[in-house]
Curated annotation (Swiss-Prot):
Any one biological process term the GO annotation gives: photosynthesis
Region (Disordered): 1-30
Record field: compositional bias (Gly residues): 13-23
Main function: May be a component of the cytochrome b6/f complex which is part of the photosynthetic respiratory chain.
Protein name, as recorded: Cytochrome b6/f complex 12.6 kDa peptide
Localization: Plastid, Chloroplast
GO annotations of cellular component type: chloroplast
Organism domain of life: Eukaryota
Predominant cellular place of this UniProt entry's protein: plastid
Keywords assigned by UniProt, alphabetized: Chloroplast, Electron transport, Photosynthesis, Plastid, Transport
Length: 30
């Protein structure tokens, strides 16, 4: 959920190097 940067701050991972595409906890498609 959210941007890759925001999810990264929540322990997630930015996917594809694209801002706005991230994963919260590496499990929730953002």
């Amino acid at each position: 959920s959210g941007s890759g940067v925001r999810s990264a701050k929540k322990g997630g991972k930015a996917q594809g190097g694209q801002a706005g595409v991230g994963y919260k906890g590496s499990t929730e498609p953002g």
